[in-house]
């Protein structure tokens, strides 16, 4: 059956959006789905299970279902006015609307392990899981910390990533997307983009303001060729632009705990050259790393300039350090770097 798509006339009557924004224009969604070409990954969409976090007004949910007819489509929405809206619009539809909190970790253990309402298939990590997709809208203020937690789960292979390499389609403020996709040596480079680069292949798919593209790497924009749409296509229309990114987990071969320790401490002092900052990893660190790093150009770099491979190289040296500190005794706030420099 085809699910009716909520229109802007009904959407605009809602009083509470809780600081989030939603694309409502079906024409723009068609352009986005054409660009994503999801059937390359999900060759048998009728076997696909989709978990939709913070679906809001459900326009994307309805369009996705009508286009791909997945086996199961579950919407996780606890916010009162939006939950009522979804129930009113999709009461007789195949969409499964669950009044649970996407922010609460216990939601997922309850959903998957206890109630077994939504049970994805575990697949090997040599490919993107072709029977499980996650989509989410975190366009509200303060979403960056939640995205960082999800990225950390990719590295630790827990949460939804215990089921393999699960693709995520993620709406966020364009300012967050710029920070997430920042390249080495750019002003927006932070621990957030370092983690993203280490654990995922992430692309900008769409954005609601062409002027925002100036904040991204020009070569990447040329490669990604994102869909550009208008602020008039989102509701509420006021406020910051939003962006959609596609996030695919990738293979990595390094010790995550030691890598996290090294990157976290170095990015706190991200504009200080390595030849003076290495004591931040532990007493005597500067002398040790100065003696081990043979590339004199690397030792002159600041953490903000380092590539993923260079961070991995420094982690390897750190693990070989006979007097390295006990990283389990480290209590540095993992988000401190996001608000520094």
Swiss-Prot record:
InterPro entries: KsgA/Erm, Mtf1, rRNA_Ade_diMease-like_C, SAM-dependent_MTases_sf. One of its GO terms (cellular component) is mitochondrial DNA-directed RNA polymerase complex. The keyword RNA-binding applies. Keywords: DNA-binding, Methyltransferase, Mitochondrion, RNA-binding, S-adenosyl-L-methionine, Transcription, Transcription regulation, Transferase. One of its GO terms (biological process) is methylation. Signal peptide: none annotated. Pfam families: RrnaAD. S-adenosyl-L-methionine binds at residues 23, 77, 101, 137. Its EC number is 2.1.1.-. The keyword Transcription applies. It is an enzyme of class 2 (transferase). One of its GO terms (molecular function) is mitochondrial transcription factor activity. Disulfide bonds: none annotated. It is found in: Mitochondrion. Belongs to the class I-like SAM-binding methyltransferase superfamily. rRNA adenine N(6)-methyltransferase family. Mitochondrial transcription factor that confers selective promoter recognition on the core subunit of the yeast mitochondrial RNA polymerase. Interacts with DNA in a non-specific manner. This is Mitochondrial transcription factor 1.
